[in-house]
């Protein structure tokens, strides 16, 4: 059985955001604006996405 994949895109700038939110975005593998990262769909990743939901967009 294959793992479910979630694609996340950084859609807002990190300028002026909290340091722990910047670290969370880096933990998701996102570096610059409009970058996309493919991650396994786990509860930990879902929590990270939820924490910075105002900065990222879930593509699929």
Swiss-Prot record:
<comment type="similarity">
    <text>Belongs to the universal ribosomal protein uL30 family.</text>
</comment>
<dbReference type="InterPro" id="IPR016082">
    <property type="entry name" value="Ribosomal_uL30_ferredoxin-like"/>
</dbReference>
<dbReference type="GO" id="GO:0006412">
    <property type="term" value="P:translation"/>
</dbReference>
<protein>
    <recommendedName>
        <fullName>Large ribosomal subunit protein uL30</fullName>
    </recommendedName>
</protein>
<comment type="subunit">
    <text>Part of the 50S ribosomal subunit.</text>
</comment>
<keyword id="KW-0687">Ribonucleoprotein</keyword>
<keyword id="KW-0689">Ribosomal protein</keyword>
<dbReference type="Pfam" id="PF00327">
    <property type="entry name" value="Ribosomal_L30"/>
</dbReference>
<dbReference type="GO" id="GO:0003735">
    <property type="term" value="F:structural constituent of ribosome"/>
</dbReference>
<dbReference type="GO" id="GO:0022625">
    <property type="term" value="C:cytosolic large ribosomal subunit"/>
</dbReference>
<dbReference type="InterPro" id="IPR005996">
    <property type="entry name" value="Ribosomal_uL30_bac-type"/>
</dbReference>
<dbReference type="InterPro" id="IPR036919">
    <property type="entry name" value="Ribo_uL30_ferredoxin-like_sf"/>
</dbReference>
